[in-house]
Design a protein with these regions (language model features):
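Alpha-helix N-cap/helix-initiation motif
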Residues: 35, 319, 361-362, 430-434, ...
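Well-ordered alpha-helical scaffold segments within catalytic/enzyme domains
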Residues: 333-335, 371-382, 440-454, 471, ...
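Aromatic-residue-lined binding/catalytic grooves and analogous aromatic/hydrophobic interfacial grooves
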Residues: 1-429, 447-449, 466, 484, ...
Length: 754
């Protein structure tokens, strides 16, 4: 089996017509739009995206542009409620959790003001081609190395081949339909009607243009250019009739009023399909091939389609080749949603077919957006971090304003949820009374510095890192004994027995203390590297040294809140208090062995009560299991993502059946962590290699802090090859089976150790 080629002999609609193929769930007739769309192939370059799907006869591409969001012109600003902070703090000090939570939610999480609510990411429309006659569906496939989809159908005259990709060089959508005999059909561009959106069309024999205007918001347009050796004629607005063609080549673009709509829309690559694909695939495949995971597998499975292999895994059978494909698919999805983008990947990457998508397809700062980029540095996709960096830095103005108006603090505040417009306004009653968004996302920015050593980048993010520290300077409350308390505080998104609100407000939750400790550390290290702000560094260091301890309960578990509370949901999907175990390295056997063991007990407790019941949560569990060296636990939860939380095309699912991309992307981070984990200043080789993968395998091109590139192979769990290409850090330490090797080399030098 080619692990970067996803091959199927059934169309996407098969999974909405056959109950057995969708886990026995009832399907709508004639087919379920939502379910069918999720069985398609996602293609994209970050700015543009499309889901390629359809039935036995029709090709359908659901189109997206990263800036097509509602709400652009809403006047959103946080309420001026800082004067109420003391009241909420006093209630928490007195132990009146319920009233403190009620008032905190009212004052600091948006209350009931829907005007500040974020608005949803929107689909741009659909492009379809319906041939006049199709005898049979033959196959469809997605090449993960190039991002090219290919579909074959049998017609009375011969074989009709359709291809599509989104060009990461030319920055347009490309489609081509070819046949060895003339074909005819209808090319259509349309969008589902919506009451607040006005659509107009302009159609010629060579072009289709659709313009849309969303009331009180953004304008957008989709432009299609069609070239054929047959006859093309306008059949009606938005539709072209194609007759007697052996080739139909399409180039498409999308634009919004976020930029210069006319200029953006008129852009074309200036190349034919083959030339465009050649330049695109060169860049795309270079990035996909920077890292290579190889696992031993059963060659007898190579003849099966991907959906057949997924079904085998659901039946409890082993399939290393499918694990390898799932790993590569996650890398493909991050690349396709980030490489040319200005915005980071949202909850669904850049793919959405719904006018009102779940959670608005927004950006969640309490795990999801961070998880999307956990793998970016180790898989050597540093370019993909740029859209995330741009997005975060755009919050500075609104984040400073909200910090002042909500809490009377300097510095920057980020809400739990946000949309494309980077407004730091809390909008959801309950969950949004949380100050941890800015410190958590600062970890992603800091990691890019650790892996790249780019001093200009560090100077660029330094104002944000210090603004986070500055917020803590003002927000923390000092006890008489000198301890700095985080007040109010919460542990996303958990609550306790008897509380009528979705999240508990307390003093110094475990996660908030961990985030504060790390964020102050980033500011300190950055200032020292840049040789600035020595006075502020002294203050930040003092605060860090006087934060509350990481508390352990009487049963040996790490306490989630500042004291032992009865959890309303012991198996809660969030693992917020385990941030210090992963993605942070606060808790390791070397640094804090007691908290490390307590965190493991907390993880086991949560799982024993049904935790990890969403795709992203299960991915986090897999990361945690890999970090603690639990090889079989890692394998169990990694494969559960395929078995229990994936469509037949391996897209991650949130119950009941909602696509969320974070599980796909988090799974890659887990796979990396199982094979090479970096903490305590060392790269730990094969720390959680499961027995199912132990026979033979290799990982080549994984990136480490310091910019080092590591490649190694193993047989029967023992290293057989090991080499390092030295990065800017010049020194790297490797650990395996209790032994540590420290290598000193010149930048760019490749040293073969085994």
């Amino acid at each position: 089996m080619e692990h970067k080629r996803m091959y199927y002999t059934l169309p996407a609609t098969a999974w909405s017509k056959n109950d057995e193929k969708v886990g026995g769930e009832a399907a709508k007739a004639p087919w379920d739009f939502e379910r069918t769309w999720m069985e398609g192939f996602p293609i994209g370059n970050g700015r543009l995206a499309a889901m390629v799907w359809g039935d036995e006869e029709i090709d359908r591409l659901t189109l997206n542009h990263e800036w097509l969001w509602k709400g652009q012109h809403k006047n959103r600003r946080s309420p001026d409620n800082a004067g109420h902070l003391g009241e909420v703090r006093e209630l928490i000090r007195k132990g009146d959790w319920e009233e403190a939570t009620r008032l905190g939610n009212l004052y600091f999480s948006g209350g009931t003001n829907a005007d500040r609510r974020i608005d949803p990411y929107q689909p741009a429309g659909d492009l379809t081609f319906l041939p006049d006659q199709v005898k049979a569906f033959i196959s469809r496939e997605l090449d993960l190395e190039t991002g090219l989809t290919t579909t074959l159908r049998e017609t009375p005259e011969g074989t009709l081949k359709s291809e599509a990709f989104i060009d990461c060089e030319g920055n347009t959508l490309r489609c081509r339909f070819t046949s060895d005999a003339p074909f005819s059909g209808t090319l259509s561009l349309f969008r589902e009607p919506e009451k607040d959106t006005t659509l107009t069309f302009h159609t010629t024999p060579e072009t289709i243009r659709m313009d849309g205007s969303i009331a009180g918001g953004i304008q957008f347009a989709v432009q299609i250019w069609a070239e054929t050796d047959g006859i093309a004629a306008v059949s009606e607005e938005g539709k072209l009739r194609i007759e007697g063609a052996t080739i139909l080549s399409i180039e498409g673009n999308m634009a919004t009023s976020q930029a210069d709509l006319g200029k953006e829309l008129s852009h074309r690559s200036g190349k034919d399909f083959d030339a465009a694909f050649s330049s695109h695939s060169k860049r795309f495949s270079e990035m996909m091939n920077r890292l290579q995971l190889t696992l031993s597998e059963d060659p007898a499975l190579e003849a099966l389609t991907v959906d057949q292999r997924v079904q085998r895994v659901r039946e409890g059978k082993q399939d290393n080749g499918l694990c390898q494909m799932y790993f590569d698919y996650g890398r493909y999805l991050l690349l396709s949603s980030s490489i040319c983008g200005e915005l980071p990947a949202n909850l669904q990457g850049k793919w959405n077919n719904n006018m009102n998508p779940p959670w608005d397809c927004d950006f969640h700062f309490d795990i999801n957006i961070e998880m999307n980029y956990w793998m970016a540095e180790p898989v050597n996709f540093p370019e993909c971090v740029e859209p995330l960096t741009r997005y975060v830095l755009r919050f500075m103005e609104s984040g400073r304003d909200s910090a002042e108006r909500l809490y009377g603090c300097r510095g920057v505040y980020l809400p739990l949820q946000a949309d494309a417009w980077a407004k730091a306004t809390p909008e959801i009653f309950g969950w949004h009374t949380w100050i941890g968004g800015a410190p958590w996302i600062s970890q992603s920015l800091w990691n890019h510095w650790l892996y790249s050593g780019d001093r200009a980048y560090l100077e660029r993010i330094y104002p944000f890192l210090t603004a986070v520290a500055e917020f803590y300077e003002d927000y923390l409350v000092r006890d008489p004994d000198g301890t700095y308390q985080i007040l109010p505080s919460q542990s996303p998104e958990n609550f306790i027995v008897g509380l009528p609100y979705p999240v508990l407000l307390c003093q110094s939750s475990a996660m908030d203390v961990q985030l504060c400790y790390d964020a102050l550390g980033y500011a300190i290290s950055a200032a020292e590297e840049l040789d600035v702000d020595s006075t502020r560094v002294s203050l930040w260091r003092s605060i860090r040294e006087h934060l509350p301890p990481f508390r352990i309960g009487p049963d040996g578990r790490l306490l989630e809140w500042d004291r032992e509370f009865p959890e309303a949901e012991p198996g809660h999907r969030h693992l917020s208090h385990l941030y210090g175990l992963y993605p942070s390295e606060l808790f390791t056997p070397e640094t804090r062995p007691e908290q490390y063991q307590a965190a493991i007990r907390s993880l086991d407790f949560r799982l024993s009560h049904g935790g990890g019941y969403t795709g992203w949560s299960r991915a986090w569990v897999a990361c945690l299991k890999a970090r603690i060296g639990d090889a079989e636990g890692f394998y169990e939860h990694f494969t559960a993502l395929i078995k229990d939380f994936a469509t037949s095309t391996l897209l991650d699912l949130h119950p009941p059946r909602v696509f969320q991309i974070d599980g796909n992307l988090g799974a890659v981070a887990a796979g990396i962590e199982a094979l090479v984990g970096f903490y305590d200043g060392k790269a730990h080789l094969l720390p959680a290699l499961p027995k199912e993968w132990a026979e033979k395998g290799s990982l080549k091109g994984v990136r480490l802090p310091g910019g080092h590139l590591l490649s190694f192979a193993w047989e029967n769990g023992e290293l057989t090859e090991l080499s390092v290409t030295v990065g800017f850090g010049e020194t790297v330490s490797l650990a395996f089976n209790g032994d540590v090797c420290t290598l000193h080399g010149r930048v760019g030098e490749t040293v073969k150790l085994i």
